[in-house]
């Protein structure tokens, strides 16, 4: 076997293709697939992934996927309280995806993902959409086993964060106005 970095983009088939190249979802030999994964990392981090797909006759295959990352609990520290404020935050993100895939010929298949993305950290959150498009070509130049895959991932708008966590309280001791809240522009 000859492979290069990112080789799964050309060779993956079935449900695993939702992540690598959605064009491979319709190449599954089964009419329906399901997958669940839970991984635990260092420092209480965990990644969850679940997906299902099924063939819809001659129309191709559709799939639904969900992946989430839980960063774990983080003790909040500040310049004034470097040992912790007693507050705990739990950042995380999730992606909910809808997939369509179709084998056009015995060699060519196409696929697309439509993803809803949500990220949160403390009092700040962001949501957005992204698209993935892929093409898979099997037996390139009529060479058995030689495949070419092309995928464009994460096409979408800029994620813009919002929430109370983007404001900081500034106390000017010489002012009689009281506390002032300033927006943090660098966080968007």
Language-model regions: role of each:
Residues 1-12, 32, 39, 47, ...:
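Outer-membrane beta-barrel porins/channels
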Residues 16-27:
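N-terminal periplasmic accessory domains that precede
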């Amino acid at each position: 076997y000859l492979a290069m970095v990112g080789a799964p983009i050309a060779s993956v088939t079935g449900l695993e293709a939702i992540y690598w190249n959605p064009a491979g979802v319709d190449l599954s030999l089964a009419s329906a697939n399901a997958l669940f994964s839970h991984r635990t990392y260092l420092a209480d981090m965990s990644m969850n992934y679940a997906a299902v797909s099924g063939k819809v006759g001659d129309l191709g295959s559709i799939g639904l996927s969900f992946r989430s990352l839980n960063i774990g609990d983080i003790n909040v520290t500040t310049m004034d309280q470097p040992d912790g404020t007693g507050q705990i935050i739990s950042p995380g993100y999730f992606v909910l995806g809808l997939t369509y895939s179709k084998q056009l010929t015995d060699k060519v298949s196409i696929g697309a993902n439509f993803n809803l993305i949500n990220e949160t950290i403390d009092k700040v959150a962001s949501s957005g959409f992204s698209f993935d498009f892929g093409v898979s070509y099997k037996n390139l130049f009529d060479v058995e086993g030689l495949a070419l895959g092309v995928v464009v991932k994460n096409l979408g708008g800029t994620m813009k964060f919002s929430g109370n966590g983007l404001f900081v309280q500034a106390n000017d001791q010489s002012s009689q106005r009281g506390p002032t809240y300033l927006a943090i522009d660098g966080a968007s």
